Amino acid sequence: MITSFYAFLDYLKNMKASSLHTLRNYCMDLSSLKCFLEKKSDLSPTPPLSLHDNTYDYPPLSFSLFTKDNIRLYLLEQIQTHHSKRTVRRRLSAIKSFARFCVKNQLIPENPAEMIRGPRLPQELPSPLTYEQVLALMAAPELDKVTGFRDRCLLELFYSSGLRISEITALNRADIDFQSHLLHIRGKGKKERIVPMTKVAVQWLQDYLNHPDRASVEQDHQACFLNRFGKRLSTRSIDRKFQQYLLKTGLSGSITPHTIRHTIATHWLERGMDLKTIQLLLGHTSLETTTIYTHVSMKLKKQIHDETHPHNLEE
C-alpha cells in the first residue's frame, strides 16, 4: 500500500495540480490511516509519509487490511481520541479519494469506503460584515508604501469579485482584462471562470501595478501580487496582514479573508442577485453550497426586524 500512497500523492501533485495545502492534508490524513493499519497488523510504527522524501524503506502493508470494517474502526478511533468532526470527515474524504484512485488503477476491485458516512456537522452560518465594516477594513492599509497599495487592492478584489485567498495569490498579470473589467480565475480542481471587477477595484489594481516601488523589487514578472522581496505573495502573508488590519479597526479576530467572500455573496443576494448567478461568480460546483446565503440573509433580516420593530422597542 505504501507505494500506492505515494503514487496517489504524485497523481494529485502532477495530474490534478493540487495546492501545497491540499497535498499536506492528504499526506497527513493518509499517514494517520497508515499508522492505524500498522497497529492492526502488529507492525512497528514507521515515519509518516513525506511530500519531499519517499526513500524510507517501509515494511509491506497489505491491501487486505484496507477493508470497510477497518476504515470504520479507524474513524471510530479518531472520534474517541477527540479529533473534531470536521477533521474526521476530511480524513474519510481523503480515504475515499485514495480508494477511487486504487480502483481506477486496478489495485483493488472495489471502493471499501464508498458507502461509509462521516459524522454530521452542525450547519454553521457564516457571519457577514456590514458594508460599513467593509469600508473600515479597506481604509486600514497605510498608503505611504507600495505594500499599503497592494493590501488595499487585495481587499478591494476580495469584496469586488468574491475571490478565494488561493485564487488571489495565483492571479497573474495576464489574467487581468482592464478594458472589459474582467478576471480569468483558476479555482478549485482546475476549474476556470471569468468574474467581473468593480471600477473601484480596477483603479486600485492599476495604481498598484503601476507603482514605481513595485517595479523596483519585482522578480516574479507573472504574479500580480508580490511580497516585499518581489516574489509571489503567499496565503500566509495575506492572513498575517489581514489580522493586523482587524486589530487596527477593532473588528473580531475570528474574521478571515474568506469572511469577505461570504459577505459579498450575502450583499449580492440582499440586493436582488439570483442564486444561480452567485454560484457562477463564486465558482461553486453545487447550487446547494450557495443556498446557505439565503439562510444568512434571512437571519440578518430577522435580527434587524427584532431590533427595529416598534413593539420590541416598547419592551
From Swiss-Prot:
GO terms for molecular function: DNA binding; site-specific recombinase activity; tyrosine-based site-specific recombinase activity. The active site is at R164, K188, H258, R261, H284, Y293 (o-(3'-phospho-dna)-tyrosine intermediate). It holds the Pfam family Phage_int_SAM_1. SUPFAM superfamilies: DNA breaking-rejoining enzymes. Signal peptide: none annotated. Keywords: Cell cycle, Cell division, Chromosome partition, Cytoplasm, DNA integration, DNA recombination, DNA-binding. CDD domains: INT_XerDC_C. One of its GO terms (biological process) is chromosome segregation. Disulfide bonds: none annotated. Residues 1-103 form the Core-binding (CB) domain. It comes from the Bacteria. It is found in: Cytoplasm. Residues 124-306 form the Tyr recombinase domain. One of its GO terms (cellular component) is cytoplasm. NCBIfam families: recomb_XerC. HAMAP family: Recomb_XerC_XerD. Forms a cyclic heterotetrameric complex composed of two molecules of XerC and two molecules of XerD. Belongs to the 'phage' integrase family. XerC subfamily. Site-specific tyrosine recombinase, which acts by catalyzing the cutting and rejoining of the recombining DNA molecules. The XerC-XerD complex is essential to convert dimers of the bacterial chromosome into monomers to permit their segregation at cell division. It also contributes to the segregational stability of plasmids. This is Tyrosine recombinase XerC. It comes from Chlamydia trachomatis serovar D (strain ATCC VR-885 / DSM 19411 / UW-3/Cx).
